[in-house]
Amino acid sequence: METCETTNGKSDIELYKLFLKGDNDAFNYLIIKHRKMLTNFIMTYVKNIEIAEDIAQDSFMYMIINKVEYDFKYSFKTYLYTIAKSRALNYLKRKKRTIYVEDAILNNVNLEGNIENEFIIKENYNALIKTIKKLKNEYQIVIYLYYFQGFKYKEICKILNQSMPKTKMAIHRAKKLLKKFVKEDNNYDEGWWSIC
């Protein structure tokens, strides 16, 4: 379970249950904790930070207004991302846009250390993004959820509303294609491309 020190060790699910009983502070903490990563996830769909922020806010508002008890065998984060995905797809249906991953990944980069290391890390991320963009949109999304968000297969299945075999196959194929693209470019530091 996900725990957090500032709320006396309560998990996200416990905080959400407190919110369902009327504790708005518990939900405010969940918003603060998940807003940035949720916005980054939505960016994989809409490629516009302002729109992603609006959809994230809309997702939280949906939860506030509806106060639904979801299936607590899944994490709160899975439930939240499922709502956000639905809202992002609704937006795309209206706008008929393409799904992108680049900005969401760059927003997750934590550059620490000296300037030379920062430059090398940024160069590697730019190379990774360029390689990921060669993948089909379906593969871009599973790579982002699995490697950059840390979701488990079961959670990805729930978020994308697809079967476990399809999810595993998509991740496997995406990794295989990434490895192929990296070898074709052969100018990357092999140690850095550990996800392949």
PLM segments and residue spans:
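N-terminal module of bacterial RNA polymerase sigma factors
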Residues: 1-37, 133, 191-196
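Short, charged helix-capping/linker segments at alpha-helix termini
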Residues: 3-4, 20-29, 39-58, 164, ...
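Internal acidic/polar
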Residues: 8-9, 98-125, 152
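Sigma70-family region 2
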Residues: 20-21, 47, 58-75, 95-96
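Structural recognition of an alpha-helix C-terminal capping motif at a helix-to-coil junction
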Residues: 40, 54-61, 74-86
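Arg/Lys-rich amphipathic alpha helix in sigma70-family domain 2
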Residues: 68-71, 82-102, 121, 173
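DNA-recognition helix of helix-turn-helix
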Residues: 89, 148, 154, 158-185
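A short pre-motif secondary-structure segment
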Residues: 142-146
